[in-house]
C-alpha cells in the first residue's frame, strides 16, 4: 500500500474530511432535509438517508461497488448513474483537489492549530449546532428503539 508517514497522514485527512466525514455527513443531512422539507416524516427520512448508509457501506466493504450494485435494486443502481452525477457533478473533484492542496501546503494544519489555540470555538459551535439538528434528534429517537435492555 505504500504507507509512508506524511503521505498516509495526507491521504487520511483528505479521505476523512472530503469523503467520509465531510462529504458523506453533508449528503446524509441534505437528503434528510430535502425529504422532511417536502413533507415526508422525519423518521422515514432518517431511515432512507442515514440509517441505511451502513447497509450500503457494508456491501461495498465486503465486495466493492460493483458487488453492491449487483445486490441493490436495478432502480437504485440506475439512480446511482443517473442522479449521482447531477448531485455530485465532476467539479466536486476540482474542489477536492483544492482541499488537497490546502492539506499538502500545511494551511489546513495551520488553520486547525490556530482554532485549537483559541479553545476551538468554531469547532464547538458546529458541534453544538449539529447536536440540535433534526437529523440528530430524530436519529437518537430511532436508535433508542433498537436499544436492548
Sequence positions of predicted segments:
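Single conserved hydrophobic/aromatic residue that forms the stacking wall/gate
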Residues: 1-10
Amino acid at each position: 500500500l505504500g504507507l509512508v508517514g506524511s503521505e498516509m497522514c495526507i491521504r487520511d485527512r483528505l479521505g476523512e474530511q472530503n469523503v467520509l466525514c465531510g462529504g458523506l455527513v453533508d449528503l446524509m443531512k441534505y437528503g434528510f432535509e430535502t425529504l422532511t422539507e417536502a413533507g415526508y416524516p422525519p423518521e422515514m427520512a432518517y431511515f432512507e438517508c442515514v440509517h441505511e448508509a451502513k447497509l450500503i457501506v457494508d456491501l461495498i466493504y465486503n465486495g466493492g461497488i460493483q458487488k453492491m450494485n449487483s445486490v441493490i435494486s436495478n432502480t437504485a443502481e440506475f439512480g446511482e448513474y443517473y442522479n449521482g452525477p447531477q448531485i455530485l457533478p465532476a467539479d466536486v473533484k476540482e474542489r477536492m483537489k483544492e482541499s488537497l492542496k490546502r492539506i499538502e501546503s500545511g494551511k489546513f494544519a495551520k488553520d486547525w492549530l490556530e482554532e485549537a489555540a483559541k479553545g476551538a470555538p468554531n469547532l464547538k459551535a458546529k458541534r453544538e449546532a449539529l447536536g440540535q439538528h433534526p437529523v440528530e434528534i430524530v436519529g437518537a429517537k430511532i436508535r433508542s428503539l433498537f436499544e436492548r435492555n
